[in-house]
């Protein structure tokens, strides 16, 4: 039953996002959604993003729309309970990138990436994201790896290109 509730709520969220064309919510997409708790008290977390980033006013815009639809939905009335928490936000710094589409807005930023080489050995690299190439079946990213500074100057490194299929995790990091 929980799985069908999750997919029903996700369908509602997707419909709201699709209906937002031409409004302040245009261009926003669903990254992740979780539903926790029992029928007595549920917590719904919705993580949204956009190619240019999501603003706070967009999160509140969608929170209102989602809450209205959930409260009006007769299919959920018996299974949701009257008391539920709804949290709508955007991915924070340090949160892993979940969708390929998210890489584009991090060009120029520091990224820590875990990837597997051709032998299947996992490696970790931190560097500035230089480019993103998304294709129908995959894509790649180009990083300029960070190196340790030696006596006041930073050593030059060559850019490295990684196929997105080889990337197991990528996390934007703060620059210090």
From Swiss-Prot:
Main subcellular location of this protein, as a coarse class: cytoplasm
Concerning PANTHER family, the annotation shows: RIBOSOME MATURATION FACTOR RIMP
Superkingdom of origin: Bacteria
Query: Does this entry carry the keyword Endoplasmic reticulum?
Result: no
Q: Which gene encodes it?
A: rimP
- What cellular-component terms does GO give this entry? cytosol
Q: What lineage does the source organism belong to? A: Bacteria, Pseudomonadati, Chlorobiota, Chlorobiia, Chlorobiales
GO term, biological process aspect, one: translation
> Has UniProt tagged this entry with the keyword Cell wall biogenesis/degradation?
no
Q: Which SUPFAM superfamilies does the entry link to?
A: YhbC-like, N-terminal domain
Q: Where is this region: Disordered?
A: 143-176
Name of this chain's protein: Ribosome maturation factor RimP
The organism named in the record is Chlorobium luteolum (strain DSM 273 / BCRC 81028 / 2530)
């Amino acid at each position: 039953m929980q799985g069908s509730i999750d997919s029903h709520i996700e369908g509602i969220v997707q419909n709201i996002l699709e209906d937002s064309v031409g409004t302040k919510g245009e261009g926003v997409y669903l990254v992740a959604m979780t539903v926790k708790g029992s029928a007595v008290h549920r917590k719904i977390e919705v993580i949204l993003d956009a190619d240019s980033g999501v603003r706070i006013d967009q999160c509140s815009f969608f929170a209102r729309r989602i809450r209205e639809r959930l409260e009006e939905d007769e299919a959920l009335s018996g299974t949701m309970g009257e008391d539920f928490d709804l949290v709508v936000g955007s991915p924070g710094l340090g949160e892993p990138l979940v969708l390929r589409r998210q890489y584009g807005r991090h060009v120029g930023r520091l990224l820590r990436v875990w990837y597997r080489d051709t032998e299947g050995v996992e490696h970790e690299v931190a560097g500035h994201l230089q480019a993103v190439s998304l294709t129908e079946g995959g894509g790649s990213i180009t990083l300029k790896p960070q190196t340790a500074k030696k006596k006041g100057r930073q050593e030059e490194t060559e850019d490295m290109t990684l196929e997105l299929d080889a990337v197991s995790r990528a996390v934007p990091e703060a620059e210090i």
